[in-house]
Every structure is written in C-alpha cells, then in structure tokens.
C-alpha cells in the first residue's frame, strides 16, 4: 500500500491538468489543423515569425507573380476574409488607407491569430495587405488584392508639383487587375517613354535623369483587344494645394432617371502614410437644388472623420427629376476657405431606357494617306440590357455641296462584361477622300445617342483632276470635241488635306508655251478645292491642271458641228420620190493625221467627193434620178491611220410616183368659205383653180373672195406623173334657208348624244387623253420652239421606286416642287409635279416643260434636268427631276442680305476684306456684278438654242450656297398680261403679247435693276395699271444707289423702245465681264 500511494497522488495531481488540456485542444481544433497545414510554409521560411492565411466567399485562389509576389483577383461586391497567425508577440495587421471604417477585425489569443473581414469590397479597396510582428518588424508576410469593376486604373491624385520630384518620380497609374508590362504604356507630352518597367501596385518610376526633358503631362494607356483606357497626370510648376489626399465622387447608380432615388457621395481620402484628416475642415456642396431642398426632395448627409484618414459627405435625392440635372461641386474647405473642389455632371434621363457613353477613341484623328487604317470605337452601356441598333454615317462637304452617306448599319452583337458594349469602325485604305465627320448613332427602345469623330487624312501629294462641264460635246477615236465658240466651264480640282490651290494653264495648237488662265471663283469642300475657269473655245488647245508636280492634262478639239448626215433635195419637198436628185453630206470633225471617208450601201462602196474646212471634213454623195431600189441604209465610214472606224448611218426611202387621181367626184360641200379639190397624187400635185374658165387661185383648198359664189369651178392637179381635173357648178342665188334649219336640228341632236357620251365615258376619255399625252411625250420630235431639235429620244427615265419624295419647297400656278432624294446615289433633287393630277390641261403644261428641258443642253447657269418619271402618266403621275439648288431664289437672297451688304464703290470700303468671299451670308458689289454676269451667260445660252424665256425676273433665278445661279422656268411661263409680271415685261409683250429674245433683253435690264437695289421693286412710284403708259411716255427706272454707271448705261440700252435697238445677250455678257474685271482691278 505504501508503495502505491505516492503514484496515486501523482495521478490525482496530473488528472485536472490533463482534462483542461483536452478541452483546450477540442476548442481550438481548427486552428491546430490550420497550423499543421501551414507548417510546411513556415519551414520554407524559418526566419519568419508570422504567416498569412486568406479565404474568400468564392473559389478564387492565391496566385503568385515574379514581380509582385502573392496576389488575388476579386470582383467588386464580394467578401474578403484574411487570417494572420503568430508564434509569439502581438500581431499587427496593415491594409490600404481606404478601408479603416469598413474593416471587421478580431483577435484570438490562442495561437495569436488576427482576423480581418471586409464585406462588399470595392474597386478602391485595391492594395496590399500585410501581417507584421510587433517584436520584430522585419518579419512579415503580405498579399496584394486586386478588386475590379469596370475601370482598369485606380483613382489617384492627378496634379504633382516639381517639388515632388527629388531622386525619382512615381506616376501612380495603379491597376485593378494584374496586367502584363506590355499592356500598359506611359506617354510624356504625347510621346511614348516607357512600356516595360510597369508595376501594377505602384505605376511607373521615372528617375531624375529620365525627367530631363521636363514633360508637363503624363498619360498611362491600357491597350488590349480593342479595349483602351487611360489616366492623366499633370506636373505643375506651382505648389499644389495639398499633396497628401485625393478627392473623388462615388454615385449609387450609373443610369439615373426620372423617379429614381439617387445618391452621390464625395470622398476625401488621405494617401500619405502619416496623413490624418484635419480637425478643422468640411466638405461642402453646390448643386442645382442644394439651396431649396423642398419637401425633403434633396437631403445632404455629412460624415466627418470616418476613420482616421477619410471624410465623406453624401447627397440623397428622392424621386429624381429633370431639374436635378446639372453640375454638382464638392468643395473641401479648411478654416472657411476653399482648398480644392471636384465637379460631377449629373445627367437625368427622362426615360428608364438609356444609352450611356462610357469611353470613345479620340474625337479628332489625323492620319497619313496610305499609312494603314484608323479605328474609331466607342464603349457604352444600355439600360436595361437588351439589343440595340447602330448606324455609322459619314458627312462631308464636296465641291458640289453637302454629302451624307451610311457607312455601316445593323444590329450590334459586340458585348463586353458588365453589360457594356463596344462598336468599332475600321477605316482602311486611307486616302484624303476618307476624311470627314463620322457619326455613330446608337438607337435603343425610345432613346438614342450620337457620337462624333473628325477624321482628317493628310496627303503629301495632292491629287488633281480636270473636269470640263460642257455636255454639248462628242468623242471621235477617243478625242473630245466641242463646238466652235463654246463657253467651256472648267473645274481644276485638287484633293488634299490641307487644301491647296490648283492652277489651270492652256496651250494652243502649234504652240509650246502654256498660258495661265484667270480663275472665276473658288469652292471648298472637306478635302477638295475647286477653282473654276471660263474659256471661249476658238481653236484646238491643251488644258493643264497643276499642283506642284502633279498634273492632269486634257486635249480639247474644235468642231464646226456635231457629226451627222444631212439630206438636201433638188426640189423643196418633204419626201424623196422617184426621179429626184438627193445630196447626202457626211460631216465629221477634222482630225490630225490622215483619215479616209467611205460611203457604203448594201455592202458596196460608192463614189463620192470630199472637202476639208478649218475644223471639219465633208463628204458628198449624190443620188441622181433616184428609183425605189435606191432606198435603204447609207453609212459614212471614217477610218484613221490606226484602222479604227467611226461611222454614221441614215436611212433613205424613195417613194414611188403616182399620177393625180380624183378621190371624190365633184366638190365637197362648202366648209365655211373654202372648197376642197379632192385630188391626190405622189409627189403631191400642184393645184390651179378656174372659175368660169378664168384662173381663180391655187392650192388644194379654195377661198371665196366674193359674196356671190355662183359659177362653174374647175381644179387642175399636176405632178411629174400626169394631171387630173375635177369640176363642179355652184349655185347661191335664191337659196332656201330650210337646209340651215335642218342642219341646226341635226347639230342639236349630235350635241345631246355627245353630252350623254361624255357624261358616261368621262373616265375613259381622261385615260385616253393621258395615254395620248404619254405617246406625244415619247414620240414627239418637236421639243423646241422654231422646230430646232437637240434630242430625238427621251432618255432621262427613272423608276419611281428609286425616288424618295420629301417636303414641299415651292409651288406655282400649274405645279408644286418638293425636295427629293435619289436612293441609289443619295443625290438631292427638286421634284416638280402637277398641282392637279386629274387635270389634263395642267398635265400638258408639265409635259411641255419636260419636253423643253430635255432638249436644252446643259449650262452652268441654266437649271438642268436630272430625269423624269413618266411611266405612270396614263394614271396622272408625272414627275420632273431637276437640280436641287440650296440657296433659294435670288430676290429673297438679295433682300435678306441688305444689312450685311458691302458697298465697294465708296471710299469707306475696307481694303482688308478679301475680294473673294465664299461665305453665303456675305454680299458685296463684286458679288452683284458676278451674279449679273452669270444671268447674262445663261440667257445668251438660251438665246442660241433658241429658246425665249418670256418671264425673266429675280424670282425665276435660283442661287446656290456657292453663289452660282441657275435660270429656271424658261420657255414655259404663263405669257399673259398679268399684273404680277407687267413690271418686268417689254412694252410689245404687254400690248401685243409679242415675246422674243429682245423682250427677254428688256426683262434682263429689269433684273439688273432688281439686283442693284438688293431685291427692290421696279417702277416703285408707279401703280401697275399705268406701267404701259409710263413706259410709252419714255419713263424708265432711275439708277440704283449701288449700281456702277457703266451697268446703268447697259440697263438703258436694254430698255430701248424699238426691239431691234436692244443689245444681244452676248454683248451684255461682254460689257458686264469688262465691268467685273475693272471692279476687281480697282480694289
């Protein structure tokens, strides 16, 4: 017993200690497990007294990087949990300054473990977390936490002082994700300075030596898979307001809209290691509704010293309204004075559906032609998420006017993370003509956003182009020919950025030296500059458009007339009959080198004679005593030395002759005061009338010249095949009037029947008339007055589906004019149609106008026909497509610029004002003379057609934005003595309705009066009813204030009473051109 007692006592003493130890182990089992798991790590780092555990609410894992060590990547909103365990000593956990008020920290004495937990982690929480031993600060472990939302760069102080730069400067473009060095680039004053030594925890470090160039602006750029972001930093010459904190905004919702409860928080965060929030300071707000705060609509919540290094204040807005939009300023004040402020623009959408632009490539881009490609991109988000449509467009100014074209259109499918999207336009094959304003329109539900870019593609070598705007030309063997005396309108166009002037020169045939041509006006586009010239063609010449060493050449040849074959008969007949002698003349232009002409009929060559004039070659073919076998196709073939052929053909038809024969025995019943011979023949016979054996008259129909027409009448018809006679006795004495009563009854019955037919078949007749009208349009060859015809076929037809008709832009008595767009070419046109589609009379007026316009050759000062839609004319649809002139009519143009008019005739003229003013809103004396010269040129062209305008006035003249005029409504005006037109009409037109080119000259003189009175009314002191009397008394309009004396002398010449004493338009043009040159030289 004595031997066991000591042992039992020892066990009794040890048992309580053993039980306490077991309980301790059970309570801290999990820490032992963790400790056991980390023992290998500790063993790898035997000198470390602490080690770091971490875990997250998701399955993210710890990763390692050679440069930054251990790290983890999280997404904003997740929860971060960290554990720091020590073998001995008191733990110390350090973390980024931003986290002081949101960290849940707990320390457990067993195993010396410190816990850190952060819920709803934010992008701004990115930073390094470290575990340190208080006894041995050198012993530590750390991990870097990246928290990403949408931006790749963390907010940071953006202004640094030169004082900050001592041995080195850190540009703190820290990232929220681990990035590779080559993905981040550093630019100093726009130049790339670093791309390799980037640390995502700190940014770029620049030594004092690297700062030798002393840049003032740094930019960090992130580029990866069409995703680009950047952040800027400024080096200030002045001392910063404060260099230990940053000020930034945080909003609660990226898509604020009407009705939403919105919050906006301003944070002041101290970033220096020893920086503390000051005790005497506050964050103040300025905003659209900050002063009113009605009904608790807007509440400001202030939090001072939230944590040691942070101040925060928030604005809460209930039921957001449009009036809440605007600038919100957060002002950091210390001791009552503002030290720094930051601004936030709040955009409140009226609808829930929104398109928010997040990022875009630079809005102004310059590139070199041929350098590759330019990418335009925009990053944006739509709310709520859904499909949207986008349209890429380009607008630019061409030398002919504004252009708007669709580059790309469709449903987007480019989606990024966080419900964001990106659109990219790759502009390849760079050249100057790819320049302009590019627009991206994003359409989503009932809202849209548009983004703009300016793209300028510069070229070291401008392109040049020579354009001759003269449609009355033709080609033979590739040579361009124009008629002698043609007024050539030549455009010398240079394509480049920046714009440069092109020079036009010409060289006459057999001359070696080029001569410079004086330019008339300049028109600029986005990447084109057009310099226009006018040349009267008198002989063959070579034209050269030149910019430096870049040259465009064009050889212009003169011809007396367009190649053609003419008929000439020995006798004056409209057809060719057996026995006639026919002369065929083939007219072709004179060509350099040796050329031969051959006539071919039924594959056989025919003998002919030739003649050469200064500008033409003529070949004559005579067919004597023609027979019907001579009918057929005759071809004139021109062959050059290269064995190339140019041919013209015509069809000759020889009619057989027929002796005169009686169509109807005896005379037809008298029709009014005429009798018909009723004898026909081929060729048409000559007729001789006899009364009672005495010659009485000629012609097929005989007119009565006596009241008593009784007698025996004979008609003798004779042609080359023979003759025939028809006779009849006419008695008029004692005639009964019963026949007239019978005829009256018969006529009344016919009228009743016709009335019934008209009332029952009105629709049929209208359709028939419209069909006949259409046939007359297609088949008519008498387009022009005086029988002159330019075109035999109507070849301007467009399909109605190719035209989009828009808003009305004008109207007249017979028609209405609307703006339209040709869908294929996006060309803007003016569309004219009848005011009443069901009116045959109105449609006929439009048809006649179309016929005339289609036959008038184009001229830069005469409104040109673009085309027509006639296929549905049978159903009352007829549209004339004309040039669209964007400046309106000349009278309104002049009246609207009276306040800005520059009178260059007086001494107070400012010599610094340029003579050439392309601005459409400006107006000067030189402009007025130039406009008058253009009208004279246009009217001279119409007079040479010939075509009488009949209603010339400034209302009938259109003007473009480049101050080029077009004469309109020519030849189809309502030539009636109307009060609205009498002030412009010549006296013979008012009194006798006599219209001619001379009456147009009178109206041109009135136009000059309108121009130099800036849209004034002619005869301002005379009532309309007395105009004719006023003119006959010798009264004329007085000289306008702004009119040069030489041009008033021209007006008086135009207003001479005898029409033959008035000048031709060619003289008017010449006199005005001289005045224009004198005016230019004088200034």
Curated annotation (Swiss-Prot):
Disulfide topology: 586-636, 677-715
Q: Where are the transmembrane segments?
A: 736-756
Q: Which PANTHER family does this chain map to?
A: PROTEIN VER-1-RELATED, TYROSINE-PROTEIN KINASE RECEPTOR
Expressed in which tissues: Expressed in amphid and phasmid sheath cells, the muscular intestinal cell and the first and last intestinal cells. Expression in amphid and phasmid sheath cells is increased in dauer animals.
Pfam families the UniProt entry points to: Ig_2 (PF13895), Ig_3 (PF13927), PK_Tyr_Ser-Thr (PF07714)
Function (record text): Involved in amphid glia remodeling during entry into dauer stage by promoting the fusion of sheath amphid cells which encloses AWC neuron sensory endings. May be involved, downstream of pvf-1, in the positioning of ray 1, the most anterior ray sensillum in the male tail.
One GO biological process term = cell surface receptor protein tyrosine kinase signaling pathway
Name of the protein this chain belongs to: Protein ver-1
Q: What is known of its domains?
A: The protein kinase domain is predicted to be catalytically inactive.
Q: Name one GO molecular function term.
A: transmembrane receptor protein tyrosine kinase activity
Which keywords appear in this protein's UniProt record, sorted alphabetically? ATP-binding, Cell membrane, Disulfide bond, Glycoprotein, Immunoglobulin domain, Membrane, Nucleotide-binding, Receptor, Repeat, Transmembrane, Transmembrane helix
Cytoplasmic topological domain residue ranges: 757-1083
Q: Which gene encodes it?
A: ver-1
> Where does the record say carbohydrate is attached?
132, 226, 261, 387, 433, 572, 603, 625, 633, 645
Q: Where in the cell is it found?
A: Cell membrane
Q: Which residues lie on this side of the membrane: Extracellular?
A: 1-735
Domain Protein kinase residues, every copy: 803-1076
Induction comment: By high temperatures.
GO-annotated cellular components: plasma membrane; receptor complex
Q: What is its main location?
A: membrane
Q: State the CDD domains in the record.
A: Ig (cd00096), PTKc (cd00192)
Ranges of residues in domain Ig-like C2-type = 563-647, 656-731
Annotated family: Belongs to the protein kinase superfamily. Tyr protein kinase family.
Query: Superkingdom, according to UniProt?
Result: Eukaryota
InterPro entries from the entry? Ig-like_dom (IPR007110), Ig-like_dom_sf (IPR036179), Ig-like_fold (IPR013783), Ig_sub (IPR003599), Ig_sub2 (IPR003598), Kinase-like_dom_sf (IPR011009), Prot_kinase_dom (IPR000719), Protein_kinase_ATP_BS (IPR017441)
């Amino acid at each position: 017993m004595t031997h066991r007692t000591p042992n039992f006592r020892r066990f009794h003493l040890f048992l309580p200690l053993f039980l306490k130890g077991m309980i301790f182990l059970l309570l801290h089992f999990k820490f032992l497990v963790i400790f056991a798991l980390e023992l290998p790590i500790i063993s790898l780092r035997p000198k470390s007294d602490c080690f770091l555990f971490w875990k997250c609410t998701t399955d993210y894992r710890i990763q390692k990087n050679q440069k930054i060590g251990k790290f983890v990547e999280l997404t904003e909103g997740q929860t971060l949990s960290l554990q720091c365990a020590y073998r001995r000593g008191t733990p110390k956990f350090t973390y980024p300054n931003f986290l002081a008020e949101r960290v849940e920290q707990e320390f457990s004495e067993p195993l010396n473990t410190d816990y850190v937990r952060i819920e709803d982690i934010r992008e701004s929480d990115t930073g390094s977390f470290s575990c340190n031993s208080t006894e041995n600060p050198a012993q530590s472990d750390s991990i870097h936490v990246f928290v990403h939302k949408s931006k790749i760069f963390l907010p940071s102080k953006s202004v640094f002082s030169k004082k900050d730069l001592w041995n080195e400067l850190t540009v703190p473009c820290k990232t929220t994700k681990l990035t590779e060095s080559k993905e981040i680039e550093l630019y100093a004053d726009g130049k790339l300075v670093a791309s390799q030594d980037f640390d995502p925890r700190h940014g770029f470090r620049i030594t004092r030596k690297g700062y030798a160039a002393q840049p003032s602006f740094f930019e960090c750029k992130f580029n990866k898979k069409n995703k680009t972001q950047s952040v800027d930093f400024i080096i200030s010459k002045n001392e910063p307001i404060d260099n230990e904190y940053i000020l930034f905004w945080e909003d609660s919702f990226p898509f604020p809209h009407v009705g939403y409860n919105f919050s906006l928080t301003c944070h002041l965060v101290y970033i220096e290691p020893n920086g503390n929030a000051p005790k005497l300071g506050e964050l103040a707000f300025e905003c659209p509704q900050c002063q009113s705060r009605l009904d608790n609509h807007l509440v400001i919540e202030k939090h001072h010293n939230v944590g040691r290094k942070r101040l925060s204040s928030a604005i809460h807005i209930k039921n957001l309204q449009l009036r809440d939009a605007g600038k919100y300023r957060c002002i950091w004040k210390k001791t009552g004075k503002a030290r720094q402020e930051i601004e936030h623009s709040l955009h409140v959408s009226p609808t829930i559906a929104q398109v928010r632009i997040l990022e875009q490539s630079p809005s102004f881009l310059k590139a070199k032609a041929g350098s590759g490609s330019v990418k335009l991109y925009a990053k944006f988000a739509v709310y709520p998420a859904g499909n949207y449509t986008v349209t890429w467009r380009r607008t630019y100014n061409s030398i002919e006017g504004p252009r708007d074209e669709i580059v790309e259109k469709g449903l987007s499918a480019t989606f990024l993370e966080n419900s964001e999207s990106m659109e990219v336009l790759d502009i390849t094959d760079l050249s100057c003509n790819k320049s302009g304003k590019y627009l991206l329109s994003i359409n989503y539900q009932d809202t849209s956003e548009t983004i703009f870019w300016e793209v300028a593609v510069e070229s070291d070598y401008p392109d040049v182009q020579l354009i001759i705007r003269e449609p009355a030309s033709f080609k033979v063997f590739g040579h361009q020919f124009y008629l002698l005396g043609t007024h050539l309108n030549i455009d010398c166009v240079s394509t480049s950025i920046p714009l440069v002037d092109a020079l036009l020169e010409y060289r006459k045939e057999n001359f070696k030296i080029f001569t410079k041509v004086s330019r008339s006006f300049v028109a600029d586009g986005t990447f084109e500059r057009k310099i226009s010239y006018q040349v009267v063609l008198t002989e063959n010449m070579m034209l050269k458009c030149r910019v430096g060493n870049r040259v465009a050449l064009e050889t212009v040849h003169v011809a007396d007339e367009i190649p053609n074959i003419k008929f000439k008969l020995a006798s004056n007949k409209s057809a060719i009959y057996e026995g006639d002698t026919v002369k065929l003349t083939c007219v072709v232009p004179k060509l350099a080198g040796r050329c031969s002409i051959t006539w071919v009929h039924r594959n056989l060559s025919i003998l002919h004679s030739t003649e050469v004039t200064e500008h033409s070659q003529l070949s004559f073919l005579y067919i004597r005593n023609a027979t019907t076998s001579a009918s057929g196709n005759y071809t004139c073939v021109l062959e050059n030395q290269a064995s190339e052929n140019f041919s013209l053909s015509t069809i000759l038809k020889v009619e057989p002759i027929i002796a005169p024969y009686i169509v109807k025995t005896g005379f037809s019943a008298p029709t009014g005061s005429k009798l018909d011979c009723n004898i026909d023949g081929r060729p048409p016979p000559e007729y001789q009338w006899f009364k009672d054996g005495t010659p009485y008259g000629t012609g097929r129909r005989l007119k009565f010249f006596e009241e008593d027409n009784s007698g025996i009448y004979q008609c003798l018809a004779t042609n080359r095949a023979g003759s025939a006679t028809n006779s009849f006795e006419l008695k008029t004495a004692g005639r009964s009037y019963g026949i007239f009563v019978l005829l009256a009854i018969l006529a009344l019955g016919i009228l009743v029947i016709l009335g019934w037919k008209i009332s029952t078949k009105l629709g049929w007749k209208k359709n028939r008339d419209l069909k006949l009208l259409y046939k007359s349009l297609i088949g008519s060859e008498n387009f022009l007055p005086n029988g002159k015809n330019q075109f035999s076929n109507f070849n301007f037809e467009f399909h109605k589906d190719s035209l989009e008709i828009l808003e009305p832009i004008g109207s007249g008595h017979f028609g209405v004019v609307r703006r339209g767009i040709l869908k294929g070419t996006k060309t803007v046109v003016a569309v004219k149609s009848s005011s009443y589609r069901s009116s045959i009379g109105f449609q006929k007026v439009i048809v006649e106008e179309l016929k005339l316009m289609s036959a008038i050759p184009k001229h830069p000062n005469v409104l040109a026909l673009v085309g027509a839609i006639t296929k549905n004319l049978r159903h009352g649809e007829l549209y004339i497509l004309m040039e669209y002139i964007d400046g309106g009519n000349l009278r309104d143009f002049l009246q609207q610029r009276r306040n800005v008019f520059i009178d260059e005739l007086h001494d107070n003229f400012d010599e610094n004002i340029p003579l050439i003013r392309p601005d459409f809103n400006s107006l000067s004396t030189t402009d007025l003379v130039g406009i008058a010269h253009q009208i004279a040129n246009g009217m001279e062209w119409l007079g040479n057609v010939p075509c009488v305008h009949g209603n010339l006035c400034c209302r009938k003249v259109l003007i473009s934005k480049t101050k080029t005029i077009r004469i309109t409504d020519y030849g189809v005006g309502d030539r009636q003595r109307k009060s609205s037109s009498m002030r412009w009409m010549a006296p013979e037109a008012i009194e006798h309705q006599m219209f001619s080119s001379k009456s147009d000259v009178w109206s041109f003189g009135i136009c000059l009066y309108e121009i130099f009175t800036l849209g004034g009314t002619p005869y301002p002191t005379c009532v309309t009813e007395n105009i004719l009397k006023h003119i006959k008394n010798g009264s004329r309009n007085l000289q306008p204030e702004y009119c040069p004396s030489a041009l008033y002398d021209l007006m008086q010449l135009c207003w001479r009473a005898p029409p033959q004493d008035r000048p031709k338009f060619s003289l008017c043009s010449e006199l005005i051109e001289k005045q224009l040159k004198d005016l230019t030289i004088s200034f």
